[in-house]
Amino acid sequence: MVSDARIDDVRTFWDSRPCNIRHSKAEIGTLRYFEEVTERRYFVEPHIVSFCNFPEWHGKNVLEIGCGIGTDAEQFARFGAHYTGIELSNNSLQIAIDRFKVSGLKGEFVQLDAETCDSYSFNKKFDLIYSFGVIHHTLSIERALQSIWNIASSGTRVKIMVYAKNSYKQAMINEGLDQPEAQFGCPIANSYSADEALDLFTKQGFSNVKITQDHIFQYKIPEYKEYKYVKEPHFEAMPNQVFAALKKNFGWHLLIDAVKI
């Protein structure tokens, strides 16, 4: 994290390289492009599908904080959710809007900052507020959570992912052995322990807070950039059961599920 970073710096960063923008070689904005982005995202991060449980939100109002280029947004809409997405990056937001047009889906998109989005009048109650890998890029996660709390109604479910401090990935970063992923170079990128995350959510007032951990990127970067999935030798040699245990205890993603009572 850059010590004097501003939210405008974060916006500029994601405008220059929207998250997952290189997940396909196809022409950006085409149906094939979006299909390949979706396939790659959920192949590398399959836990997103189970965490979101898209079919559960059929007919429900869903708000996504930080929709990016709209991959998860598309799935919510395809499974029948009444979808609203906000996004800091204008370039990312426009791709998400184009994605819905190309795919023939309905949704509402607004350019907003996670820390101040509660100033916007959504004129609806949300059954789910979802955010995956976003609010750890804010100047104040406390302010972002307060905004989410203010938007939420009694009974609103909240599902949020933030980076995990006690993780394999963070250990590699600390030792200068980091394998770059989407966040590499972002001016603001914080990580949290499960206890810190629990404290943040409970202090804000959320109830029934459940936290799990998942995701270790296991592929060689040069090959991955060429859309080939070749595991690092130590992961290739690791039994599936051991790798599952490693993800559960040292995964890069803290998956937080809570509710506003």
Please provide the spans of the model-predicted regions.
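N-terminal, positively charged/glycine-rich alpha-helical extensions of SAM-dependent methyltransferases
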Residues: 1-35
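Conserved alpha-helix/loop element of class I SAM-dependent methyltransferases that forms part
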Residues: 30-60
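Class I SAM-dependent methyltransferase SAM/SAH-binding core
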Residues: 60-117
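A conserved beta-strand element that flanks and buttresses the S-adenosyl-L-methionine
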Residues: 130
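A short glycine-rich, Lys/Arg-flanked "PGG" loop and its adjoining helix->strand segment in the class I
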Residues: 142-157
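Conserved class I S-adenosyl-L-methionine
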Residues: 157-180
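A C-terminal cap/extension of S-adenosyl-L-methionine-dependent methyltransferases
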Residues: 172-182, 195-199, 209-261
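Short alpha-helix
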Residues: 188-205
